[in-house]
Amino acid sequence: GDVYKRQVSVGEGYGRVNLIGEHLDYNGGCVLPLQIKNSIICELSKNREIDCISIASDKYQKTLSIEKLKKTDDWADFIIGSCLFFGEKYSIIIKELSFNISSTLPLGIGLSSSAAMTVSTLKALNNFYKTTMSDDELIDLAYDIENSFVGVGGGIMDQFVSVLGNQNQALY
């Protein structure tokens, strides 16, 4: 019935290039990043899988039990970490959701696809649950997920640019 009406929430996270200062943001140095138009989009909807979430892209399909939600050592960790950290922050049990991921952002070549993935997922969760996460909270949470859960070491520049960047203006 009405419980499974297809409510779709979308989040988008952008990639970036860094004009100067690569590897300096996590050492306290100056950087000059620029958001690019390439992005990762997370479409989030309710599913009928009790106590599970499903994650899909054009090359990936996985259904995960909420009871056993833990690191998988693949790119799904960005979504899993987002579910766990977002759920903890807002006291929400994340379940019965489908995450459909699409991307125009090449992965693994230094354009901050990890930040874009985490940001897009958190934005979709924020929209779906109608929470009031500020941009600063989103940036901090995405940073914590990448560093504490996924294990991607780095500074906060990538998350900052993905959320607050402008494709026509570098950030200093």
Language-model segments: residues:
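Glycine- and acidic-rich phosphate- and metal-coordinating loops
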Residues: 83-84, 88-107
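DPxDG-like acidic metal-binding loop motif
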Residues: 35-36, 111-131
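Short, small-residue-biased leader/transition segments that mark boundaries at the very start
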Residues: 1-4
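ATP-dependent small-molecule kinase catalytic core of the GHMP/sugar-kinase superfamily
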Residues: 27, 127-172
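Glycine-rich, flexible beta-strand/loop modules in the N-terminal catalytic cores of phosphate-handling
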Residues: 43-90
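A short glycine/serine-rich beta->alpha loop
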Residues: 25-29, 64-73, 103-111, 146-151
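Structural signature of FAD isoalloxazine-binding scaffolds in flavoprotein oxidoreductases
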Residues: 29-48
